[in-house]
Structure formats: C-alpha cells, structure tokens
Amino acid sequence: MCSLRHVSIVMSQETEDGQFGEFGGRHVPEPLQEPLAQLAAAFEDVVPTDEFQEEFHYLLADFGGRPTPLYHAETLSERWGTDIYFKHEDLLHGGAHKLNNTLGQALLAKKAGKERLIAETGAGQHGTATAMVGAMLDLPVKVYMGEKDIERQEMNVFRMRLMGAEVEAVTRGNEGLAEAVDAALEDFAENMEDTHYL
C-alpha cells in the first residue's frame, strides 16, 4: 500500500524540468510539453493531499478490491527450495492489474478539471480498465483500437462499450496498436485542454 510517506519520498527526488539524476530527462514533441507541465503541476498539487490519498485508497479497496491476496505455492516452493508466492492481481475488479494505473490517473485527471478520458489499447485490457474508471468517475471515455485488434478481442470491445466507452476503430496502416497510439495522440493534440490521455 502506498503511504503519504512514500509519496513524499518519491516527490522529494529531483523533478525540476523532468530531470532524474545525472542522465535523466524527457524528450517529447513541442505540442505536448505544456500539457505535460500542467499534468506535473497537478500531480504535485493534488496527489500528496490527504483528500486525494484517502479517496484514492478508498477506491482501490472498495472499487478495485485491494489488497489482493498472496497465495503460497507450496508445491513449487518445495521443488525450488524457497518460498514462492503469487500475488493475485487477477482478482482486481476487471481481472487485471491495469486498474492500479487507470484509477490513479483518472482520479488525478478529474481533480485537475479534465472532462474526458482517451486511451489506446491492443488486447483491450487497458481500454477496459479505462472504461471502468471513466464510468465510475462519470467521465466520458474514448478508446482507440486497431480494426484487427477489435476483430481479435471482441469480448473486451463488448466490455468497454458495456461500460459506456466509445471504441473507435483505427483502419489505417496495419490497423494495430501503433496506429491506435497515433490516433489517440492526434485526439489529445486537438483536445488537450479538456482531455486526459491515459
């Protein structure tokens, strides 16, 4: 579980201008620099607050189902001569660890005044997790997905739509994840004032 102490340790690391240590840094296209600066400012203003931490941890537990259990794999432990445990992130709401990321990002986006969420997905797990938190936080969601991936992952497309997300088929190029990323970035570049790209 993340604590306020952990957040303060992470935030006390060198972060000015995106630098982390001697060789750290960031390189992003010019149009994305301002929204990333706004996101960094929102993160520093919102995430360390008691209000955000309490809501985030409440939602992780109540909505997400955290903490997930550990399973002691006795047979494997005996075979390998050490204790082996499996962490059951598959028991989170939605069936995957993706919720850990999307829940925090979407909550931060809402607190920062963003009005919609966009994402790209290949197999559909990230899109499904984004759709879940968008529905829970009452934020519209648009998920970009390559046409070929839509055909392969019909059940996840159904789940995203069931939760209210618009799934946009990307039909250019190889009709896969790379093209879905391009489409999502184009949407974000046009709508960055009110949109958060997960």
Where are these regions (language model features)?
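PLP-dependent amino-acid enzyme catalytic core
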Residues: 2-198
